Amino acid sequence: MSLVECVPNFSEGRDRDRVNRIRDAIASVDTVKILDVEMDPNHNRSVITFVCDSSKAVDAAFAGIKAAAEIIDMDAHRGEHPRFGAADVIPFVPLQDTKMETCVRLARDLGKRVGEELGIPVYLYAEAAQRPDRSDLAAIRNKNFQYEQLKEAIKEEKWKPDFGPSVVGKAGASIIGARDFLIAYNVNLNTSNMEIGKKIASAIRAKDGGLTFVKSLAFFLKDKNMVQISMNLTNYRKTPIYRAYELVRLEAARYGVLPVESEIVGLVPEQALIDVAKYYLQLNGFDEGNILERKMEKAANME
């Protein structure tokens, strides 16, 4: 079996019944295991993580996109997070011995099917991009260019989709790709000042001279009256969680602001948390071999 992970992001984070319908559509496909469902009402966005055999990955992702297109009206959607469509971003991630080339093929096969069968415009990104200017997700969709702007811009040659029509319906557009594992990590600050948040987000993101492998945005969380620094850590081995957190803390201190909590959206590799423990506890020579549960699993597998 060739395993892949898929982490589709859907533009619904407030209605659990709707999210469950999308989840169930994905889970109905053979070999699919749903690992996690995260809902965020401030962003009005959900992230569903599933794994399956690569031969079933396109069917499973397509089922989720189709369900989302049927129940989410982007004209009525409001949320803090940038978005293009009901099924907004759908990345495939290689697991175990699966090659990135496999995920690229899956992304392109899915994009073609979504464009042809559902009539939804599709943009390929990351490793699956067919145009160099679309390899970076933020170059396609960002806080200043979302669903509303795409409705007009899609008529231009620059915004011609890789698959599907050059017309945006109520399901919006989908961005489909293949990438390595990333960690979605957010830090909430004890301020409601978005200008401070924007300065911190700019200071830590790679493209503005911050940390390599970090993408960041600032959001205002209305229900908490806090600013959130939302990050994607695209290589946690080279830029670990603790380093991103410490730079946020350092930059925030300039303005008399402190982090009050942080969160991981979706799943995280065990090694990423081991790295955090080693840093803050100054552990020497610590690895997964020191974790009781790992030893127990190994012993059980030897029986």
UniProtKB/Swiss-Prot annotation:
Task: Show the GO cellular component annotation of the record.
Answer: cytoplasm
What organism is this sequence from?
A: Thermoplasma acidophilum (strain ATCC 25905 / DSM 1728 / JCM 9062 / NBRC 15155 / AMRC-C165)
Would I find Ligase among this entry's keywords? Answer: yes
Q: Which keywords accompany this UniProt record?
A: Cytoplasm, Folate-binding, Histidine metabolism, Ligase, Transferase
EC number(s)?
2.1.2.5, 6.3.3.2
Pathway assignment reads: Amino-acid degradation; L-histidine degradation into L-glutamate; L-glutamate from N-formimidoyl-L-glutamate (transferase route): step 1/1; One-carbon metabolism; tetrahydrofolate interconversion
InterPro entries tied to this protein: Formiminotransferase_C (IPR013802), Formiminotransferase_C_sf (IPR037070), Formiminotransferase_cat (IPR004227), Formiminotransferase_N (IPR012886), Formiminotransferase_N_sf (IPR037064), FormiminoTrfase_cat_dom_sf (IPR022384), FTCD (IPR051623)
Q: Where's it found, cell-wise?
A: Cytoplasm
Identify the catalytic residues.
81 (for formimidoyltransferase activity)
Source superkingdom: Archaea
* Keyword Transcription appears in the UniProt entry: no
In UniProt terms, what function does this protein have?
Answer: Catalyzes the transfer of the formyl group from N-formylglutamate to tetrahydrofolate (THF) to yield 5-formyltetrahydrofolate (5-CHO-THF) and glutamate (Glu). The triglutamate form of 5-CHO-THF (5-CHO-THF-Glu3) can also be used as substrate. It can also catalyze the transfer of the formimino group from N-formiminoglutamate to tetrahydrofolate (THF) to yield 5-formiminotetrahydrofolate (5-NH=CH-THF) and glutamate (Glu). It can replace YgfA to catalyze the irreversible ATP-dependent transformation of 5-CHO-THF to form 5,10-methenyltetrahydrofolate (5,10-CH=THF).
Q: Which family is it part of?
A: Belongs to the formiminotransferase family.
Q: Where does folate bind?
A: 164-172
Q: Name one GO biological process term.
A: L-histidine catabolic process to glutamate and formamide
**Which reaction equations make up its catalytic activity?**
(6S)-5-formyl-5,6,7,8-tetrahydrofolate + L-glutamate = N-formyl-L-glutamate + (6S)-5,6,7,8-tetrahydrofolate + H(+); 5-formimidoyltetrahydrofolate + L-glutamate = N-formimidoyl-L-glutamate + (6S)-5,6,7,8-tetrahydrofolate; (6S)-5-formyl-5,6,7,8-tetrahydrofolate + ATP = (6R)-5,10-methenyltetrahydrofolate + ADP + phosphate
Protein name as it appears in the record:
Glutamate formimidoyltransferase
Q: Which GO terms describe its molecular function?
A: 5-formyltetrahydrofolate cyclo-ligase activity; folic acid binding; glutamate formimidoyltransferase activity
NCBIfam families found in the cross-reference section: FtcD
